[in-house]
């Protein structure tokens, strides 16, 4: 099956061997996205809401680079470091999905960068082949 790698302009080097997004058969898979700048430094340390906004803006850039919009996102995998941040994460998340919400799950776990508070991976259905 043909696939297309999606790397938005200005994307920093990934922390491991992966790409920001892969489009195959009209489905976009967005890699786990941390609140990182182009040099892989965590941004907005200690602020789960600001980190969530940064992560969702990064995901939005991947989806848009593939020709879609956030309305095309059908599933989100949310990883958070501390349940105490659940409300702040949800408040920002709701801004990006004001209409019909995508399916999702949310788990608490350790993240690869110790000061990161949230990571999100997404799936979007764009309705067009790679």
Curated annotation (Swiss-Prot):
Provide the Gene Ontology terms for cellular component.
Answer: cytosol
Concerning CDD domains, the annotation shows:
YjgF_YER057c_UK114_family
GO BP annotations of the record are:
nitrogen utilization; uracil catabolic process
| InterPro entries in the record | RutC, RutC-like_sf, YjgF/YER057c/UK114
* Pfam families recorded: Ribonuc_L-PSP (PF01042)
In alphabetical order, the GO MF annotations are: deaminase activity
Stored SUPFAM superfamilies? YjgF-like
User: Which keywords, in A-to-Z order, does the entry hold?
Assistant: Hydrolase
Q: Which domain of life is it from?
A: Bacteria
Enzyme Commission number(s) from the entry: 3.5.-.-
Q: Kindly state which reaction or reactions the protein catalyses.
A: (Z)-3-aminoacrylate + H2O + H(+) = 3-oxopropanoate + NH4(+)
Q: What's this chain's function? A: Involved in pyrimidine catabolism. Catalyzes the deamination of 3-aminoacrylate to malonic semialdehyde, a reaction that can also occur spontaneously. RutC may facilitate the reaction and modulate the metabolic fitness, rather than catalyzing essential functions.
Record's NCBIfam families?
RutC
Report the sequence similarity comment from the record: Belongs to the RutC family.
* Name of the protein this chain belongs to: 3-aminoacrylate deaminase RutC
Question: Which gene produces this protein?
Answer: rutC
């Amino acid at each position: 099956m043909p696939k297309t790698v999606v790397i938005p302009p200005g994307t920093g080097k990934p922390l491991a061997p992966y790409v920001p997004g892969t489009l195959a058969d009209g489905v976009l898979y967005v890699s786990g996205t941390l609140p990182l700048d182009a040099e892989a430094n965590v941004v907005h340390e200690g602020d789960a809401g600001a980190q969530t906004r940064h992560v969702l803006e990064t995901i939005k850039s991947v989806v848009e680079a593939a020709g879609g919009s956030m309305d095309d996102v059908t599933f989100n995998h949310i990883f958070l470091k501390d349940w105490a941040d659940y409300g702040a994460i949800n408040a920002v998340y709701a801004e990006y999905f004001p209409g019909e919400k995508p399916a999702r799950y949310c788990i608490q776990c350790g993240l690869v960068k110790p000061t990161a508070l949230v990571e999100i991976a997404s799936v979007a259905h764009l309705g067009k082949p790679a």
